């Protein structure tokens, strides 16, 4: 479905000569297939966010390619990219319009993309709220009236509303306690198995990655330094950074 081949993305240093160019993504190759779950793990500044923006078509690589069904993803109209690949961000509150109630927030993508008329979109929004284990009264509430965990569930429901082929979860469980983190991850796992979208977790938290992923990529200094497949045996580790991550891992979600 989505494939990256030898992707490089460099950010120039700007007008001042002493500011060197930064190679944020260096020769990355990976593939995402529907029905599978992936994780991209790395510390802050490792290039995860840049790679995420490349995979969604928000950025264009300097060299290499990122394709959706064999066609450059950036060549698709924005509406088609938006429908195929959804991004669920870390901060649910800032991702939701504070002026709009929850039901409308979930329905709007369906209306704006012409998936269905307003009445049907609102009906589907109510069903999606149930799918993410939210009570019916949340439909008419504003984002500020919800907890952080509830806001993230609404964002997941909104992402599901356009029936995407891939959802990228960018630090989606950050800020949740252990119990709510486990609940959120189990919810996504259940939805992914039912709806068969590709799920990519972008995280600094190896515990989340190991709990969710079939395939785990470790990113450091803009490059994928290790690719691990479940059950993530230490014998498949090739890079010292991955070994360090594994040694420090506190699952917390088992």
Model-inferred region functions:
Residues 234-254:
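C-terminal boundary and immediately downstream tail of ABC-type ATPase nucleotide-binding domains
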Residues 120-137, 247:
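Conserved ABC ATPase "signature" region
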Residues 16-19, 72-86, 100, 104, ...:
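ABC ATPase NBD coupling module
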Residues 41-43:
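The feature captures the beta-strand-to-loop junction immediately N-terminal to the Walker
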Residues 142-146, 150:
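Conserved ABC ATPase signature
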Residues 56:
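Helix-to-loop junction immediately C-terminal to a conserved catalytic motif
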């Amino acid at each position: 479905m989505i494939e990256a081949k030898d992707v490089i993305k460099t950010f120039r240093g700007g007008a001042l000569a002493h500011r060197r160019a930064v190679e944020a993504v260096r020769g990355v190759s990976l593939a995402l297939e529907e029905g599978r779950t992936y994780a991209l793990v790395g510390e802050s500044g490792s290039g995860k966010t840049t790679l995420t923006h490349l995979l969604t078509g928000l950025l264009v690589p300097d060299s290499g390619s990122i394709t959706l069904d064999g066609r450059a993803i950036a060549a698709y109209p924005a509406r088609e990219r938006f429908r195929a690949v959804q991004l669920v961000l870390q901060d649910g509150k800032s991702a939701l319009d504070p002026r709009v109630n929850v039901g409308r927030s979930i329905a709007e993508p369906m209306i704006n993309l012409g998936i269905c008329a307003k009445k049907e979109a609102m009906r589907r929004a109510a069903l999606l709220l149930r799918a993410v284990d939210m009570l019916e009264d949340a439909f008419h509430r504003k984002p500020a009236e919800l907890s952080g965990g509830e806001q993230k569930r609404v964002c997941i429901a909104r992402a599901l509303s356009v029936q995407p082929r891939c959802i990228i979860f960018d630090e989606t469980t950050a800020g949740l306690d252990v119990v709510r983190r486990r609940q959120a991850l189990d919810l996504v796992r259940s939805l992914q198995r039912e709806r068969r979208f590709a799920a990519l977790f972008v995280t600094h938290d190896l515990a989340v990655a190991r709990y969710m992923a079939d395939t785990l990529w470790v990113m450091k200094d803009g490059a994928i330094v290790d690719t691990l497949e479940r059950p993530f045996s230490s014998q498949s580790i090739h890079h010292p950074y991955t070994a360090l991550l594994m040694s420090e891992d506190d699952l917390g979600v088992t």
